[in-house]
């Protein structure tokens, strides 16, 4: 059976209705995605909003929380599916801090769903690894990656993983992933970041599409028939769309 898988960091500042439009345009069956936010004062819940607009099943879990931030109280990752979700799980790979002082200190979470694809099980996982200026792989980031690898190392069949790994193709993070799973996204030379000018508190800027930070991996039994970087005006990351056979 052929499925379309979409991986996208939607950027929490983006117009959520534009994100919905682009997801619909992709005709994706399963979406792994990052930077969903919640705020109780405005009843904001971007993961639920997207799921409702698509008519999809979904699972979201918070990675970290803040007090007194105008734009968000919580941020996390989500998986959306055209098919029923049989079970879910989540694991923190960097514990939540509540009011983290910078991006490296933020909690990071692995989110997983088991889907029933017309009688066939398919496990989908996602995460959003820590940001460092220049995407430097520090010892802390290596530890975070190792925590993630310990989760996925036994995923040998019917498994897909999409994520913003905040790491380039030649990094420790990606090299470790390649020992466990196969790339089912486009060639690593195709870039996904920054789709819009990026400025991290004046410490680090990216003006153009200079980096590949977003990936789709799968167990060896899954065959990829097509993969592309989607062009869009929205979000600071470009989405990856792949067609797979299970």
Predicted regions and their residues:
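N-terminal, active-site-proximal structural segment of metallo-dependent hydrolase catalytic domains
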Residues: 1-56, 60-73, 146, 246
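Active-site-proximal beta-strand elements of phosphoester/diester hydrolases
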Residues: 2-11, 89-91, 121-131
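Active-site environment of divalent metal-dependent phosphoester hydrolases
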Residues: 12-15, 38-42, 67-69, 98, ...
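Active-site neighborhood of phospho(di)ester-bond hydrolases with catalytic His/Asp-centered motifs
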Residues: 32-34, 60-62, 160-164, 183-186
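Structured beta-strand-rich core segments of catalytic domains in phosphoester-bond hydrolases
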Residues: 35-121, 228-231
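His/acidic metal-ligating clusters that form di-metal
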Residues: 112-125, 138-162
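Active-site-proximal segments of metal-dependent phosphoesterases and phosphodiesterases across multiple
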Residues: 128-148, 169-178
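Metal-dependent phosphoester-hydrolase catalytic domains
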Residues: 153-159, 166-246
